[in-house]
Amino acid sequence: MLQPKRTKFRKQFKGRIHGTAKGGTNLDFGGFGLKALEPNRVTAREIEAARRAITREMKRAGRVWIRIFPDLPVTSKPTEVRMGKGKGAVDYWAARVKPGRIMFEIDGVSEETAREALRLGAAKLSVRTRFVQRIAE
């Protein structure tokens, strides 16, 4: 699963996800993509599950680009532990996703295959998404 090799600090504040995506809103690599329609945190497990579903449907043909990276450490305290005594240990890594962000791109397959692959991948994610494709020039 994806996670940073090293970070400046082990733990981060929770933060809020305001506004729409400033960058990463256009298809830069592939011909088809999956665009987020709502703000949310997407975990590294979700990203990996979606990647597997997409590559399986594409039958190893074409190419997949993951445009988001889980760089936010999410902490949790063990069960039945009283409040206080510091912040919990890092439980998993997540990526903050804003509306308009392209999360996955694929190329080298037909539109029907791309549509079905991204539909299966979107089912693994905790955000509503839309299928997008490059405008023929």
Curated annotation (Swiss-Prot):
GO MF annotation: an example: rRNA binding
Assembly with partners or alone: Part of the 50S ribosomal subunit.
GO CC list: cytosolic large ribosomal subunit
Xref: InterPro entries: Ribosomal_uL16, Ribosomal_uL16_bact-type, Ribosomal_uL16_CS, Ribosomal_uL16_dom, Ribosomal_uL16_sf
Domain of life: Bacteria
Assigned keywords, A-Z: Ribonucleoprotein, Ribosomal protein, RNA-binding, rRNA-binding, tRNA-binding
Stored Gene3D superfamilies: Ribosomal protein L10e/L16
Similarity field: Belongs to the universal ribosomal protein uL16 family.
One GO term (biological process): translation
Cited function: Binds 23S rRNA and is also seen to make contacts with the A and possibly P site tRNAs.
Designated name of the protein: Large ribosomal subunit protein uL16
Pfam families (UniProt xref): Ribosomal_L16
